């Protein structure tokens, strides 16, 4: 984890707490899912000035917190939630999806022609972007599909219109004094790390119900795709 953190922060800067919208603006766009920040960077470079917006999906959400990536004005927001909801969320999507690393649910026929893969991800019939990283076919598909005709407001699992990301160890430690004082004063009495990968089985709402019931004097930290069960909830703030 230390090596991954070092590589990401030295390349893209230290993550900053960031609000991320779930609204998709009208016009051509591309959805990028997976974990590979380098692929996202290359796509942002190749789409700059082409009138195409980029939206993260799933574990690509933290990209919005990195200063180097945030500088791209067409990195607009996040679309959808976790991996197990791909078939529902991508159904008839008027945009292509780039899968970088990890989870790919078998595409439905309604969007199979919009699936593009790269690196270790592949699927029969899907266009695979090789190591040259020429995203021209993906860009052309986005322009062909055209996106939504009007802005579309989406929400998280619990109806929230935005999510937050970027509360990494550096961000927390930069406010260590404030946190310690809040603990001493009793403003913060609990820390909960709600972490883990999610699954597709219906009724898996333990994470959501747990977080909803955490007391107001608690801090909730999260890891992995289980966060989409509750990261759109407004839990308020402690001391700003």
What are these regions (language model features)?
Residues 1-240:
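Metallocofactor- and cofactor-centric catalytic cores in central/energy metabolism, strongly enriched
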């Amino acid at each position: 984890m230390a090596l991954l953190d070092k590589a990401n922060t030295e390349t893209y800067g230290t993550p900053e707490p960031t609000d991320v919208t779930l609204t998709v603006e009208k016009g051509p766009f591309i959805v990028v899912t997976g974990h590979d920040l380098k692929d996202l960077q290359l796509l942002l470079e190749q789409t700059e000035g082409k009138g195409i917006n980029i939206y993260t999906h799933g574990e690509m959400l933290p990209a919005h917190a990195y200063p180097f990536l945030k500088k791209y004005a067409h990195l607009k927001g996040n679309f959808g939630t976790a991996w197990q909801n791909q078939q529902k969320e991508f159904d008839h999507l008027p945009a292509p999806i780039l899968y970088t690393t990890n989870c790919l649910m078998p595409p439905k026929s309604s969007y199979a022609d919009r699936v593009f893969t790269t690196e270790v991800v592949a699927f029969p019939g899907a266009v695979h972007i090789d190591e040259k990283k020429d995203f021209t076919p993906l860009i052309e598909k986005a322009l062909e599909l055209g996106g939504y005709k009007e802005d579309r407001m989406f929400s998280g699992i619990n109806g929230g219109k935005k999510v937050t990301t970027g509360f990494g160890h550096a961000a927390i430690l930069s406010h260590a004094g404030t946190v310690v004082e809040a603990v001493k004063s009793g403003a913060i009495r609990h820390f909960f790390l709600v972490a883990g990968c999610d699954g597709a089985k219906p009724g898996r709402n333990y994470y959501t119900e747990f977080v909803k019931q955490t007391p107001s004097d608690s801090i909730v930290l999260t890891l992995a795709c289980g966060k989409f069960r509750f990261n759109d909830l407004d839990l308020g703030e402690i001391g700003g």
